[in-house]
Amino acid sequence: MIAVQPMKEEDQAQLSLLMMELTGTQTDATVFGRTFRKILEDQQYILLGAYHNGELAGTAMGIVCMDLTGDCRPFMVVENVVVSANHRKLGIGRQLMLAMEEQAKERNCYYVILVSGKQRVEAHRLYESLGYRDEGAEGFRKHF
């Protein structure tokens, strides 16, 4: 059985392993812990975990952003959607995204936006099956 719920401090070690699976790099444990706690405390962040038989199998992070256009309703940016390789093909990514969309609706967001690497073809199929589409916008990123 899969349970999707907000993450807690005791999930830190398992989440660190998931993030390493996503990026291929290990984050300094002290920095990771400090940032993790800040995210948990910030009401504009939603950090969800998907648990399969009590084990953290996936995660997604949403950030609610204010907007100054139209009705000034907020929107949500979704980042760091990852399902462990050991738990794929169980519908976990879909459940995480649907739960994140519910969080966005509860916060009166008028849309959800996400960026996904071109190589993540399977993830793109999931997003498209959930109604996400390419609106002709280009994503740009600058690293510092």
Language-model segment annotations:
Residues 1-15:
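A short beta-loop-alpha structural element at the N-terminal edge
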Residues 17-30:
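Helix-loop element at the rim of GNAT/NAT acetyltransferase active sites that forms part
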Residues 27-47:
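Active-site rim helix/loop that mediates acceptor-substrate recognition in acyltransferases
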Residues 49, 55-64, 77, 82:
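Conserved beta-strand in the GNAT
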Residues 67-78, 88, 136:
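A conserved beta-turn-beta hairpin within the catalytic core of GNAT-like acetyltransferases
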Residues 83, 89-102, 129:
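Conserved acetyl-CoA-binding loop-helix of GNAT-fold acetyltransferases
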Residues 94, 106, 118-136, 142:
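Conserved active-site alpha-helix within GNAT-family acetyltransferase domains
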Residues 97, 104-116:
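Conserved GNAT acetyl-CoA-binding A-motif
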